[in-house]
Regions:
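Glycine- and acidic-residue-rich catalytic/RNA-contacting loop of pseudouridine synthases
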Residues: 1-39, 95-101, 112, 120-121
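Short loop/turn positions at the edges of beta-strands in beta-sheet-rich folds
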Residues: 35, 45-47
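SH3/SH3-like beta-barrel fold
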Residues: 41-43
Length: 131
């Protein structure tokens, strides 16, 4: 897909077609679990553009819960999400060329111990699987 940034609106737009000002985006995702219309995803950015995950997921019909800009505000309100259900739980450094003063990070991975919305997701998932 392609992403075009609108600076004045502080928003990006996704399209299947390239334009003069667009940049290609690549986003890889894996569904970890799902419940009704909600999914817990592991998302990997293959390109790193402004708002890429948020806008790309909304473009394919799966906006982030709690995202007031690209998501569904009625849904956010219904579930009480004031913040995006988006978390960088893992950061992996794989430099393909010399990274200078950051080279000591090459090959290292850092993982967050807990993601704030996962317990809430699984509470809803258990009620989902019992119905």
């Amino acid at each position: 897909a392609y992403l075009e940034k609108n600076e004045s609106q502080n928003r990006v737009y996704i399209s299947s077609k390239s334009t003069k000002n667009s940049k290609i985006i690549k986003t890889k995702y894996t569904v970890i679990d799902e419940c009704r219309h909600f999914s817990l995803l592991d998302v990997e950015l293959l390109t790193g553009r402004t708002h890429q995950i948020r806008a790309h997921m909304a473009y394919v019909g799966h906006p982030l819960l709690g995202d007031g800009k690209y998501g569904k505000n009625a849904q956010n309100k219904r579930f009480g999400y004031k913040y995006q259900a988006l978390y960088s739980y893992k950061l992996k450094f794989c430099f393909e060329s010399p990274a200078g003063s950051l080279n000591y990070l090459n090959g290292k991975t850092f993982v967050a111990p807990k993601v704030w919305f996962v317990d809430d997701f699984y509470k809803n998932l258990s009620s989902c699987k019992n119905t």
